[in-house]
């Protein structure tokens, strides 16, 4: 059970690998609007969808039906299955299962905009005042109540990082086992000879904080920055870089082009607070060190150390342009970062290790039903 299929991104890569571990699995989602050229990872499976799929304007505005999603996910009849795996960052774990079934929920994150990020979500959505704001607050209140209740229907929680495991404990009062997401490190080639530019790459959305990276480099004209990615904030990023000849905005690029820039970059700069964060791991797979905002999943995936034989990057403590700029100075003064160490660290998050860990944890839940609840 996955929430929605609208593009092939991080959570869909997890689903892809779950399907490889359990190739006989049937697939359910609230909506499925994947383009034909993005469906390959489903292996020809038909996705069974909810009534939201057929509602007006669902293709482009399915998120507007958030208040209906708890009802929709509860309508799936999964009673014929011994094992149910939900891929959850919103409502997927709310599927109804019986006492004779095992429900394992792989949690990318609890529904952040209903919990600790509610106020940020309302602010960035322009829903701080007025009738719509109060309707949104009421909807999120009831969503929290539902989200808490449905946690009781999960037999075993899997978290995509220690950071998310702490969120699960805080939100649901449940322990979880950490199974890091699969990163296709084999797709990336380690390069030892680096060029004299820095790379930032992500979707251009507010929480990624791409503007602060561009602002930082605009104030350092002697240092080169390449920016890859597309999204709602792209025009803002372009405007910030308009008078900075040292900042090159490439927009969307293919994975092959991104991998090439990652391998050649002096360092990868990352300013988001992510629950896991795949791109910093991909950069390390290229032998490229990471300069990251020190919060969230990067504290588990990037190794900061005074020992050059152990370190793969360093952190800055505030999401500001000044903090990024100071981190660049610190990085350049730190001395050598070894590509081999970066690559070895990235291997901890390989597809092979994900499959092994997932299989072990699910088999454990199936084998010991009387003690599987955590």
Which residue ranges define each predicted feature?
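A charged, aromatic-enriched C-terminal amphipathic alpha-helix characteristic of glycosyltransferases
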Residues: 319, 333-363
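Donor nucleotide-sugar binding/catalytic pocket of nucleotide-sugar-dependent glycosyltransferases
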Residues: 112, 136-189
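Conserved donor-binding/catalytic core segment of Leloir-type glycosyltransferases
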Residues: 189-226
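Acidic donor-binding loop of glycosyltransferase active sites
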Residues: 263-275, 288
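Short hydrophobic beta-strand element within catalytic cores of glycosyltransferases
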Residues: 289-294, 299-302
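Active-site donor-binding segments of glycosyltransferases and PAPS-dependent sulfotransferases
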Residues: 21-93
